[in-house]
Amino acid sequence: MSRADRFIKACRGEQPDCTPVWFMRQAGRYLPEYRAVRAKVSFLTLCKTPELAAEVTLQPVDILGVDAAILFSDILVVPEAMGMHLVLDDAGPQFPEPLRGPADARRLHVPDPARELRFVLDAIRLVRKELAGKVPLIGFCGAPWTLAAYMIEGRTSRSFERAKAALLADEPFAHGLLSRISEALAGYLQAQLDAGADALQIFDSWAGALAPSDYARLGAPYIARVVQGLRRDRKQPVIVFGVETGELLAQLAGTGADVVGVDWRVPLDQARPRVGPAAALQGNLDPVSLFLPPPALEGRVRRVLEEARRAGGGHVFNLGHGILPSTPVENAKLAVELVHRGLPAR
């Protein structure tokens, strides 16, 4: 089996020649090569320049030996394309004019990806050409709740109290906004598939801010809408991932995604009963493990692999969240080697 097949086979619940591995945020600040590119342009310019986005997307494939590339972009380019003013600087992402009610939401439009998000699609085409089938390419978007949280709050937050209060207090506003975002995301993801993406990941970064009962209203149903909005004959797998979602895993599995990402707080063999047998699992090494001495890192990688073996079904090795900016590159390489080496035969 070739390196190109591992990731897709695992997403389908099959057993490849070895466990595939990639890392969320694998194209990022921990790589000197990324920092060299980033030093020349702003973050948003990097996202919107297809040649540069393609360059940094490809870096970890060659440097680390991972089994999938994930497009370098940002989840917030979609709200911007819908009509919001986005500022990305050292203070983090900001919407200076956040949504304050239904009237603001009605001014948002569903963008035409071929026109308003063309830079993303052009980057996908460039990456596909350079990869030449070496490994699959993952496209992505943010989940409706996570995007709505940013759009109402105006910036990142620990609790997103303004967004939660606004959506919980006004059901028509919540439904209208989340429905419009879902429609935009379905079109955006389908355009990524049409441009050549081999798989998709939906990031619900702030899923854990909601109680399970609220997530059942504001979160999972709208991810399901996005998945259902893709072409029914699609063959590319869809991954869904959220942070602090131990109590939400069953809901994530119910969205129709082919793979459920698990953060490091829930062992994979404990996640399996919550997810059920149908979906593959992705995860879930604590990102801090990549700072440990090699023997300790090896022990933690082996533990994840052992938990995945006990869980059964397909498994894509990943971190339980994004790779941290000060991660030693050599340790990230070692983790990839250890995953590929696998566990001794029983």
Q: Where in the sequence are the language-model features?
A:
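N-terminal basic, low-complexity leaders that serve as flexible interaction/assembly modules and, when applicable
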Residues: M1-D90, L126, E298, G313, ...
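Short glycine/proline- and acidic residue-enriched helix-loop micro-motifs
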Residues: S42, P102-D112, L167-A174
